Amino acid sequence: MNVRPEEPGWPLRDRLVVSKGHASCMLYTVLAHRGYFAPAELKTFRQIDSRLQGHPCMLKTPGVDMSTGPLGHGTSVALGMALAARLLEKSYWTYVLLGDGDLNEGQTWEAIMAAAKFKPERLVALIDYNKVQLDGPSEQIMPMDPLPEKRRAFNWNVAPAVYDGHSIVEVLKSFDWVKGQRQWPAAVIYKTHKGQGVSFMEDNAQWHGAVIDDATYTKARQELLQTLQKLEELV
């Protein structure tokens, strides 16, 4: 993304709306590594008076383009940002990251229809499709399949492949596709597993926001460190 960490409010920056605001720890980690704040501040996550709260706040945290939390708002906000770019004759990109719960919300689909009508340039939906949400498997809560066909039926330009959201190579391929598009709005779907990398959490809705104890913390940390080591070997 075209951003300036030293100038978070730069008018020409690309925008990212993390509609699934409960994934804030992921966003904060990326922001820290991009230089918006020191990585040491990550240790204050969800503490009183910390800038890094459980849901991202654009008034507190540099690099956060939109405060999010209640699901379903992100696509509407991103649409507004993309339309603003057109009105202001700016060329920034607007990305919105959605999860399964977002796709259950009626407002999301209203925004999807509106975006197809107004066709703002450089509006891209990134869909984290793990088929698990707060209350259980999405198939039991509110099935979304066939998701690619549904988005196309709403006149979105959907990537021809469903990408592996856990593969950096696949993610980079998806953005190669995005950057080559001229039909808007566009959407990319990523197949993921909730809790990937921690064996006892993977695809298990019971760990959606659950608190771990010392034993599970130790096990999770060991597994994640093993994954990190493998990634560093690839680099």
Label the model's feature ranges.
Residues 1-117:
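Cofactor-binding active-site loop characterized by glycine-rich and histidine/acidic residues
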Residues 17, 124, 160, 187-189:
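Structured core elements
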Residues 22-23, 130-131, 165, 191-195:
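Glycine-rich beta-alpha junction loops
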Residues 32, 36, 47-50, 83-86, ...:
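Generic secondary-structure signature for well-ordered alpha-helical cores
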Residues 37, 143, 212, 216:
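Short acidic-hydrophobic sequence patches enriched in Asp/Glu that either
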Residues 63, 67-180:
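Thiamine diphosphate
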Residues 168-235:
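Glycine/aspartate-rich loop-and-adjacent alpha/beta segment that forms the canonical ThDP
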